[in-house]
């Protein structure tokens, strides 16, 4: 997910520094640092569903004459959370701006999945410090997954005392109250909930576009992979009720949206927390096949929860696309066990076989971690061989990044960083090799493309995606933006296809 280019900082006069203090007291009742033992004890406590979200009278026109700016880091869930916060700001009367210089409120919606993401946030906070000196009335906030980590929040408070508010992932709906407190408080407002929040329906949203939309179907994760901070920052698995999801998607379809992506930290665990009905992702997808919308995707999947019923439903096609993102992380059963992925290499390959049998034209992509603590050359080679055997179209690849509080962060590691980097280079070379081979097979084919807009590299060229998530660039009238068209592929590159328009537009059945 690309971030907006960092705005240049300006030299300004210093302002009075806030009194240094210990912020840990704010966490005593609402926050506990990551604990695998305690987190695994969380059971199927009843999750309340609040359907009557509304702004109290005291907040009417609260933001009139003010502007907000949100910078988002990380995954699609964060992007969607930003849409919700933008909706709340708009309901309060704020106007959006694309410049921190013009903003009255700046929020950084953060990601904690890797150290690099956290470093970017701290770097941005450093830039914003100068802006705060220049404009003391500016409110600066940090939210998202980093805010759920006590050590990170303490670091923010100690080294970035120009931050006015910190809140987490479970209480976004409390944004109006947090803003009000920050506006009138002389000290930083910290509101971080350790316990998962309820499911809040009917929150206002300002979606990024009018062609594609993200729809949360569940929150949290109960898998506790040893390297992952998400179960701690996002909480236990909580599923939205199917009728609420279907209603939202029907509403989006009625408003002209062409593609929906169902979101969840572990999306195919959907429904496992229901106690009154037996209902999973396969059941939901089967019902969504009947909705009059062109395409439905979902992300992100865990192989452990990818069941036969879901595969059977996906095989029915229709508006259910043929692209499946299925993170494997490693091709070594030994490594997978240490990662606590709860499946083996053989199980993953059998799952892939079932998917390809039910969906012969399925396109699979994945995530892979290299350099996990004590990964041997042989174990890395198993990852390379699995990649070839599956025949992925592409992959997101990473060097392992320790996350404080996770079991893996305590593991001793004897693999030098130079070796990890060399392995990543070799893996990326394989990813690139297979990507161009896969794309070359599209030459001469006619594909269905949902036109997103102008190409980022050439405004005279349109760009869109196939059902299998291939980027296609082609020359056509801008009036086709938002439409489904047929394009003949004329050239293939590693990460995209070029083509010629052959038919416009396609009616959605």
Curated annotation (Swiss-Prot):
Region of interest called Disordered, as start-end residue ranges on this chain: 1-26
Biased composition (Basic and acidic residues): 16-25
InterPro entries tied to this protein: Elp3/MiaA/NifB-like_rSAM (IPR006638), Methylthiotransferase (IPR005839), Methylthiotransferase_CS (IPR020612), Methylthiotransferase_N (IPR013848), Methylthiotransferase_N_sf (IPR038135), MiaB_methiolase (IPR006463), rSAM (IPR007197), rSAM_horseshoe (IPR023404)
Cofactor, free-text remark: Binds 2 [4Fe-4S] clusters. One cluster is coordinated with 3 cysteines and an exchangeable S-adenosyl-L-methionine.
Cofactor: [4Fe-4S] cluster
Binding site for [4Fe-4S] cluster 1: 75, 111, 145
SUPFAM superfamilies recorded: Radical SAM enzymes
Chain ranges of the Radical SAM core domain: 207-437
Domain MTTase N-terminal: residue ranges: 66-184
Residues binding [4Fe-4S] cluster 2, per UniProt: 221, 225, 228
Molecular function GO terms recorded: 4 iron, 4 sulfur cluster binding; metal ion binding; N6-isopentenyladenosine methylthiotransferase activity
One of the record's GO cellular component terms: cytosol
Domain of life (superkingdom): Bacteria
Compartments where located: Cytoplasm
Catalytic activity: N(6)-dimethylallyladenosine(37) in tRNA + (sulfur carrier)-SH + AH2 + 2 S-adenosyl-L-methionine = 2-methylsulfanyl-N(6)-dimethylallyladenosine(37) in tRNA + (sulfur carrier)-H + 5'-deoxyadenosine + L-methionine + A + S-adenosyl-L-homocysteine + 2 H(+)
Purpose of the protein: Catalyzes the methylthiolation of N6-(dimethylallyl)adenosine (i(6)A), leading to the formation of 2-methylthio-N6-(dimethylallyl)adenosine (ms(2)i(6)A) at position 37 in tRNAs that read codons beginning with uridine.
Record's subunit section: Monomer.
Membership in a protein family: Belongs to the methylthiotransferase family. MiaB subfamily.
Designated name of the protein: tRNA-2-methylthio-N(6)-dimethylallyladenosine synthase
